[in-house]
């Protein structure tokens, strides 16, 4: 299992504040911040039955796949934004620096322009924290190398083998 990055309390509080503001301004069901390996860092809102650990790992793999798509078509940088439109809910993903991803899950009644505007602002605010995080990661590179595969494997195993999941696996978000 990848080693979790321990963030100072002041950074955790700032992340929570940014996520709370984003959720309120966009009327999102929930928002979360994960590292690029798929480890959930923080989440705010009402997730219902959603397994955020699995969703974080899947969004990270989605970002990795689209980064390769960008490379394949000749882009010099990975795509920074993604939007998935559903019949009930949508997901808007933003890459924050090189190590974070921000996800906004919202009902179809919410205007995408609103989500895009406030996600961009939140991403800009999170960039300073991402820079600090990336310095920590550079000091422990093995965490990022092993983290993505392990997180994705565990998330897919839990998703595909629900009998292994216990009631204690639930994440409670303030």
Describe the predicted segments one by one.
Residues 1-30, 37-174:
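Acidic, low-complexity cytosolic segments
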């Amino acid at each position: 299992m990848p080693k979790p990055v321990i963030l100072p309390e002041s950074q955790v509080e700032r992340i929570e504040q940014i996520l709370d503001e984003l959720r309120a301004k966009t009327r999102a069901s929930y928002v979360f911040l994960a590292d690029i390996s798929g480890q959930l860092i923080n989440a705010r809102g009402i997730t219902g039955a959603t397994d955020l650990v699995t969703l974080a790992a899947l969004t990270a793999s989605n970002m990795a796949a689209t980064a390769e798509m960008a490379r394949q078509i000749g882009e010099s940088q990975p795509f920074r934004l993604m939007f998935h439109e559903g019949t009930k809910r949508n997901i808007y993903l933003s890459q924050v620096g090189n190590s974070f991803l921000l996800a906004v899950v919202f009902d179809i009644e919410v205007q995408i322009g609103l989500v895009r505007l406030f996600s961009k602002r939140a991403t800009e605010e999170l960039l300073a924290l991402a820079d600090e995080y990336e310095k920590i990661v550079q000091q422990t590179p093995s965490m990022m190398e092993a983290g993505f595969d392990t997180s994705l494997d565990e998330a897919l195993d839990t998703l595909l083998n629900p009998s292994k999941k216990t009631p204690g696996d639930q994440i409670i978000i303030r």
